[in-house]
Amino acid sequence: MAAAAAAPGGGGGEPRGTAGVVPVVPGEVEVVKGQPFDVGPRYTQLQYIGEGAYGMVSSAYDHVRKTRVAIKKISPFEHQTYCQRTLREIQILLRFRHENVIGIRDILRAPTLEAMRDVYIVQDLMETDLYKLLKSQQLSNDHICYFLYQILRGLKYIHSANVLHRDLKPSNLLINTTCDLKICDFGLARIADPEHDHTGFLTEYVATRWYRAPEIMLNSKGYTKSIDIWSVGCILAEMLSNRPIFPGKHYLDQLNHILGILGSPSQEDLNCIINMKARNYLQSLPSKTKVAWAKLFPKSDSKALDLLDRMLTFNPNKRITVEEALAHPYLEQYYDPTDEPVAEEPFTFDMELDDLPKERLKELIFQETARFQPGAPEGP
C-alpha cells in the first residue's frame, strides 16, 4: 500500500501528543470513515490519512510513547495475494533495523486465529511522501541530493540483506518535516536470487510500470539488485523535473519511452537478453539515438546527471551498484562509509510464499505477530 505511514500534504495542523489527553472508554472502538479501528486504549484520537487496495491508514496518539503514530489497518484474509504481501512485509520489517527503512513499532490483532479479521501495524508517523512533495513544489538541488543520499543509504542496507525491494517509487518514500526519509512498502520484496525463476514472479509482479527496469519486461528470470537502482534513477530524474521520466501507458509503450531517451541498445546489451522473442522485437525497431541528459535537464547539476546516467543504464550488468552510487561525487558532502550500516546477516524466507493457500498464510501472519500480544516474551 503506497505511502502507508505517510500523512498527506505535510501534515499541517496535526495535533501532537499533549499531557492530560483523555483516552477513550475501554472497550469503545473508534471509527474512521466508517472503518472501526480496534486499537484502544493505548491508541486514541484517530485521524484519517489514506487508503490502499486492502487497508486504511490513520494517525493516532500513542499513550505509552506520548507521540502520534501511523496505524495501518490491513484486512487481507480474503485474498491469497494480499496475505502474501502482508506476511512478506511483516517478516522483513520486523527483522530490519535502519534509519532509512520504516520500522514496525507494534502490531495489534485478535487473540485467536479464528477471530483474526484484521491486522493493525503501528509505525512512525511521517508527514508526507516524495510523491506528494513533488506534486506541491520543485526541490532544490540540496534537497534532491539529501533525499537521494538517504534513499541509497537505506537501499545499501536492504541489498546487504540480499533483499530486492522491487517497488521503489516516490509514494513509497516517506518524509517528515525535518527531511528524514524512510523507505516503506516491502510487500513485493524478494530474496535476490538471479538463478531462480520465482513461481508466479511475473504474473504477480504488479510494481508500478514507470519505475520498472527494462530487463523485468524483457527477461523471464534472473533479476538482480540492479532493478532497484534503475527505479532510484527514475526517482532522481523525477526529482530533477517534477515529472516521471518514462510514463509508459502499457508494456510496449514503456519500452519505447526508455529507448526514446537511452537510444537503441548495443549488440552487447542485446546479448544479455535471454528471451529471444524480446531480443528479436528490439532488433526489429528503427535505430534511435541517445538523448543528452543535459538537454532533458538543462538546469540540473552536472554531477547529478552523471550519476543519473550510470543508474539509467540499459544493461543491468553495467549499471552502477548502490555502494558505487553512494561514493559518487554528487553525494560527496554526505558520503560516510562508516555511517552507512549493513545488515548483520543475509535475510532468508523460511519458505517460498507464492504457492501457499491463504489459510496457511493467515496462520503464518498469526505466528509472526505473536510477539506483540500481551504477555508475550520480548522479541529480538
UniProtKB/Swiss-Prot annotation:
Q: Where found?
A: Cytoplasm; Nucleus; Membrane, Caveola; Cell junction, Focal adhesion
Q: The Protein kinase domain covers which part of the protein?
A: 43-331
> Where would I look for the motif TXY in this sequence?
203-205
Annotated positions of the Phosphothreonine modification: 199, 203, 208
Record PTM text: Dually phosphorylated on Thr-203 and Tyr-205, which activates the enzyme. Ligand-activated ALK induces tyrosine phosphorylation. Dephosphorylated by PTPRJ at Tyr-205. Autophosphorylated on threonine and tyrosine residues in vitro. Phosphorylated upon FLT3 and KIT signaling. Ubiquitinated by TRIM15 via 'Lys-63'-linked ubiquitination; leading to activation. Deubiquitinated by CYLD.
Report the EC number(s), separated by commas if there are several.
2.7.11.24
Question: N-acetylalanine is carried by which residues?
Answer: 2
Q: Which InterPro entries match?
A: Kinase-like_dom_sf, MAP_kinase, MAP_kinase_CS, MAPK_ERK1/2, Prot_kinase_dom, Protein_kinase_ATP_BS, Ser/Thr_kinase_AS
Under the heading Pfam families, the entry gives:
Pkinase (PF00069)
**SS bond list:** none
Which Gene Ontology CC terms are recorded? caveola; ciliary basal body; cytoplasm; cytoskeleton; cytosol; early endosome; focal adhesion; glutamatergic synapse
Provide the activity regulation entry from the record. Answer: Phosphorylated by MAP2K1/MEK1 and MAP2K2/MEK2 on Thr-203 and Tyr-205 in response to external stimuli like insulin or NGF. Both phosphorylations are required for activity. This phosphorylation causes dramatic conformational changes, which enable full activation and interaction of MAPK1/ERK2 with its substrates. Dephosphorylated and inactivated by DUSP3, DUSP6 and DUSP9.
Give the family this protein belongs to, as stated in its UniProt record: Belongs to the protein kinase superfamily. CMGC Ser/Thr protein kinase family. MAP kinase subfamily.
- Protein name according to UniProt: Mitogen-activated protein kinase 3
